[in-house]
UniProtKB/Swiss-Prot annotation:
Residues 21-34 have a biased composition (Low complexity). This is PI-PLC X domain-containing protein DDB_G0269228. GO terms for biological process: lipid metabolic process. Residues 270-449 form the PI-PLC X-box domain.
Length: 574
């Protein structure tokens, strides 16, 4: 039996219950013939959702004797913006709200929403997509809501992995093995990830202006959970605390000799088609926001998620929001406030165990005070790189610096430690705060009305801010690197250079060629990365085999790739 998807609508009480069911072409029975029970959708004190009478409830249920082990699922809006990060390997009956802040999504009735499914083909085998989902939907009572399956737009070379075995039938159950995160990543990133997708479109002509969307997934297979609201579980510890767990092995290494997972345009997860564009950006104004957003959004997980998945370098760009002047992260379009990014860092780096213990009764006990200090922050080294700050005035630079110092009080390492700083020297102040204010010199006007030839140094008296040009090398040419082949060719030369005792970034970044209009309008940065990134993984595997040093590996959509596994392996084995 194949997978089955069910969408249900809970209407007003004066309407008949409607059920829209997608059935398999090979079976005559639906997943569930019963109407959604009140137990499923009623308010519950323990629920993180509030479900009102007029809310739209959308359920996706899986029932099948599938041989398939792994799924990747994401929710998109009609502009193909990822609303939230990928959900990997759901446990049976787990529920999740697609929102970075763990709150309800307020549905825009003017938009369609899509769910994309990626399948892993373990056998390098495929079946016709018509066997994967039935495209005939039964709509009771002629309700105005409808589901449309956009299967005609699927690429002709689409291949999906087998979802069934003809030797088994509906009632034959399988025992699926429990797998570790390492094994999951190994399976997914052995270049078997199929980059094509099935798109299920659902649309609701709501009588209210605001609806809540809730997604529920279930499956006979109890899957290991890689993404969830709760990041404190056992299986996240190897990523969330990977430096702490391997402290004895890495503490005497210089930070610039570590392999560190990095995030490009790290906080662009908030960009969507309705986001404002940054004034003066180079993107032509005639290109609609629905297209610009697809290429401006480089991450789908928030900073806390990225930290939890082991990422330790963050590329952060700041500009003032129009009218309000509030400091925001940007990449052609405005994303989220800087304060949100800093709050996520604080949330992650603070050691909650410290705050659960009583204070020492003897303030003169230096040993006890040292133990408490050791417990204050996690021993996870983080590099923040504030750059592309050309939109900020002197006053806004000062505002940003004050916010960073205030939010990250006590966590910032002094730049006097230098670029040869060792991991153990950052045990109590784990954040290296790299700041680039070079753009200021272009706008400083002297008394004679001429631009200053001397750079304005806004961090001269700020020892907790490391100079970008003295601390970091991050070379890239956005005018040339339009294919993975171009980037890898450049990186192959870059790894052989002497980076003059600085941290250095290997930018595994693809830049779209503005001349390829068809590619721009029909694709997105996310889909492009999924198709090209296995080549980057192969490149770094070759570096590992030859023991070629590398430092920061920076990627788009970083939580989708196994760079943390790679970093841990190299840091503890070399």
């Amino acid at each position: 039996m194949f997978s089955s998807i069910m969408f249900k609508k809970k209407p007003k009480q004066n309407l008949n219950e409607n059920e829209i069911t997608s059935q398999s072409t090979t079976t005559t029975s639906t997943l569930s013939d019963s109407k959604p029970s009140e137990k499923k959708i009623k308010d519950n004190k323990n629920d993180k959702f509030k479900i009102n009478e007029n809310d739209t409830i959308v359920e996706i249920e899986w029932e099948s004797d599938i041989q398939q082990k792994y799924d990747l699922i994401a929710l998109y809006d009609n502009d193909t913006n990822v609303i939230d990060d990928y959900i990997w390997h759901w446990k049976i009956n787990d529920e999740y709200t697609y929102n970075n802040n763990n709150t309800n999504i307020i549905r825009d009735p003017n938009k369609n929403y899509y769910i994309k499914y990626w399948r892993i083909d373990d056998n390098n085998n495929g079946i016709n997509h018509h066997h994967h989902y039935n495209h005939h939907h039964h709509i009771n009572n002629h309700h105005h809501n409808h589901i449309k399956t956009n299967h005609h737009s699927l690429p002709p070379n689409l291949h999906l992995s087998p979802l069934h075995n003809n030797n088994h039938h509906r009632h034959h159950s399988h025992q699926f093995p429990k797998v570790s995160i390492n094994n999951v990543y190994k399976q997914i990133h052995n270049y078997k990830l199929k980059n094509h997708f099935i798109r299920q479109q659902f649309q609701n002509n709501s009588t209210t202006n605001q609806d809540t969307i809730k997604i529920k997934l279930s499956h006979f297979e109890e899957r290991n959970l890689l993404k969830s609201v709760d990041y404190s579980g056992e299986m996240f510890k190897q990523y969330s605390n990977w430096m702490t767990n391997n402290w004895e092995r890495i503490k005497d290494k210089m930070v610039r000799d570590l392999v560190l997972p990095g995030s490009h345009d790290a906080a662009t997860y908030g960009i969507k088609s309705s986001s404002l564009r940054v004034p003066g950006d180079k993107v032509p104004s005639f290109i609609p926001n629905s297209i610009v957003s697809k290429w401006s959004k480089t991450q789908s997980g928030n900073i806390f998620k990225q930290l939890t998945m082991g990422y330790r370098y963050f590329d952060l760009r700041v500009a003032p929001y129009p009218v309000t002047g509030k400091l925001y992260i940007y990449h052609a379009m405005f994303s989220v406030p800087v304060s949100e990014v800093l709050d996520d860092i604080v949330k992650f780096i603070k050691n909650t165990n410290y705050y659960q213990q009583p204070n020492s009764s003897n303030n003169n006990d230096e040993k006890q005070q040292l133990q408490q200090q050791q417990q204050l922050f996690k021993k996870e080294i983080i590099l923040l790189h504030w750059n592309h700050l050309g939109y900020l005035s002197i006053e806004q630079h000062q505002e940003l610096q004050l916010m960073i110092k205030s939010k990250l009080d006590g966590m910032l390492a002094n730049r006097q430690l230098g670029n040869n700083v060792k991991v153990r020297e950052l045990e109590f102040t784990p954040i290296i705060n790299i700041y680039d204010d070079n753009g200021l010199k272009k706008r400083i006007i002297n008394d004679d009305g001429k631009k200053s030839k001397q750079p304005f140094d806004s961090i001269q008296n700020e020892p907790l801010f490391w100079y970008s040009n003295k601390s970091l090398v991050s070379n890239y040419d956005s005018n040339q690197f339009h294919t993975s082949k171009d980037v890898i060719s450049f990186l192959s030369r870059e790894v052989t250079y002497n980076h003059k005792d600085r941290f250095w970034v290997a930018q595994c970044i693809l830049t779209i060629d503005s001349k390829k209009l068809l590619h721009i309008t029909t694709n997105s940065l996310l889909d492009w990365n999924h198709s090209e990134f296995p080549k980057f993984l192969k490149f770094f595997e070759n570096l590992e085999e030859k023991k070629v040093p590398t430092n920061i590996i920076m990627t788009d959509f970083c939580t989708h790739y196994p760079i943390t596994d790679y970093a841990i392996r190299r840091n503890i084995n070399e």
